[in-house]
Swiss-Prot record:
Protein name, UniProt field: Phenylalanine--tRNA ligase beta subunit
Domain tRNA-binding per the UniProt entry, residue ranges: 39-153
TM stretches of this protein: none
Top-level taxon of the source organism: Bacteria
Subunit-level organization: Tetramer of two alpha and two beta subunits.
Subcellular localization: Cytoplasm
Species assigned in the record: Streptococcus agalactiae serotype Ia (strain ATCC 27591 / A909 / CDC SS700)
Gene for this chain: pheT
GO molecular function, one term: ATP binding
Chain ranges of the B5 domain: 406-481
Amino acid sequence: MLVSYKWLKELVDVDVTTAELAEKMSTTGIEVEGVETPAEGLSKLVVGHIVSCEDVPDTYLHLCQVDTGDDELRQVVCGAPNVKTGINVIVAVPGARIADNYKIKKGKIRGMESLGMICSLQELGLSESIIPKEFSDGIQILPEGAIPGDSIFSYLDLDDEIIELSITPNRADALSMRGVAHEVAAIYGKKVHFEEKNLIEEAERAADKISVVIESDKVLSYSARIVKNVTVAPSPQWLQNKLMNAGIRPINNVVDVTNYVLLTYGQPMHAFDFDKFDGTTIVARNAENGEKLITLDGEERDLIADDLVIAVNDQPVALAGVMGGQSTEIGSSSKTVVLEAAVFNGTSIRKTSGRLNLRSESSSRFEKGINYDTVSEAMDFAAAMLQELAGGQVLSGQVTEGVLPTEPVEVSTTLGYVNTRLGTELTYTDIEEVFEKLGFAISGSEVKFTVLVPRRRWDIAIQADLVEEIARIYGYEKLPTTLPEAGATAGELTSMQRLRRRVRTVAEGAGLSEIITYALTTPEKAVQFSTQATNITELMWPMTVDRSALRQNVVSGMLDTIAYNVARKNSNLAVYEIGKVFEQTGNPKEDLPTEVETFTFALTGLVEEKDFQTKAKPVDFFYAKGIVEALFIKLKLDVTFVAQKGLASMHPGRTATILLDGKEIGFVGQVHPQTAKQYDIPETYVAEINLSTIESQMNQALIFEDITKYPSVSRDIALLLAESVSHHDIVSAIETSGVKRLTAIKLFDVYAGNNIAEGYKSMAYSLTFQNPNDNLTDEEVAKYMEKITKSLVEKVNAEIR
């Protein structure tokens, strides 16, 4: 949120410096990112009046005689297409500084002396995105009343100071100038004074021209007004200045009024050309799958049923809460305007704007919340401004569907509750003073008091919120500080802390680097790599659409990190994270999710770089699986791997489920190529393991065995098998053969190709036998091998090679 200090001082009497104000606001709850002055670095820029303007033959140049308040006219050569006689312009005289610290000097252009430069706003350092359309390809034209020789800074409000606020979701009330004014007034104990407009309505009723119908529960309220006989023209300079200093491009007086009201009230508005409507009934409804709409930016949007649209005669004319449609755009010939002020479901707007990658000032405010109390007032204010700036005639009444609660919210607490939480000894009088500054009504006594919270502060709902407001306005610096009291105790690690340390040791020993990713993600990514379907826990007031749901896997966030690095030429990555995921089996609005500790890692690129002796070695499934095996060897747990084809985001032929005592605790494998393409990453292998389940196994008592003094005996066996037979199937057949002295099974070769029939493969195993109490004889080992061979033949149809 960009706040003009000049504009702010029109709303509340504050006479401190912007540096002091920024410090005070940051310490009371709204962080200030910085303060900038548009005129910083600029100098010697004055108003010039073009007395004459002659075209230079065979060039695009113009030779201008300019009055800059000096005794003589100043000759300036200008190439702008919109320069002409009789206009007031910005002139940088010799010695002036413009953008990028460029110094203007006297010079000659095509042999003609030029004593300065006629400037565009771009040349003063203003962003192309906020410059009025009429001046985007030429020089800025100043108001007719500008006096030659005067500094241009005050005419364009370039001497203003712009305060950039970082608004958190809980303080969306500060996404308006009135909201910021209320905050500043509370901090300094001042009163706000807001401009009021005198709205004069015609006898003709708006309800006789249009009607409004709501057909979606995502639309809480929809209001419309009609203003006829408007004259569409550029906005006055003061209005353009306010919009540009807030980061918004001026378009024309009608559109600019809606944006001005958005900045003033925080109420998004839209203006339709009524004459372009194909009907008289405005319908707010869900879009239909496959429905299309060309928005104001000229893009054709494919809509889905989750989107909201405003429709007339069953044809969409606006993407509700996000952007208007091109078919009803306000143009220079528009005469009758329909103003819209509505309240849409924030979650729906967030999903639509995120899906279409179409963020706007309106959508961000709908996502975070709207002040119900000023929707109607904002509409009337906009209509009055069109009456004033566009000569419009306002038809009588608003056409409204849907009722919004506007009464204050009652929140009660006690003085004891407040003082206990803050460690203070505040009196009821102190509390009254705080809420008087905030503009909240309070009644009651020290035993119990009730605060009437106006609708503009929809973030306050419980007594803890009242305590926060008291602390903010009373002053955090005034709260007493005490050292914590606790007896000295012998500390020890919890079982989870010990497990984390052991996992971290294995991971870093394998060359993995630890990272920390966001616990918040999109609803789609939240469940992307989940092994079981659970409900999604979404935030009510997310800061951004990309951080709106609690993750149920760590892999998706890790792939975002890999994509970020790969895009910056860092393509050999081995990273891990130990963090929580949030599984929700109940109602996300009523039940807390279950927090599950996980260990996740991702590998991409090369394991070993190419050198003069060896070839480059890329990451593969077995390298990733080896890290998992090393972990469980360290943890002294036996796990099995079973081929997994059910994870949509994982490669069906290179993914395995990890089982501990028959229970699924994770997976390891290659990210599906299509998923990798979506993330714009190369071939990547990942694993995610449930540490919470492992922790319960770690708490079991260990059983130690004596080290035997008798040697082990090994035998190799090679098998010809169908390709569909898995390693797990073979190990299971060997283990269930009834051989008690078998201590180890190790796969050391897999082959398919020449001399092997199509559809078959060769797998070779090393089997280890040992008797802890005696030496094994060859005859005993031979019997064991016979049993194993028989089991393999019967259970997996193996052929001994």
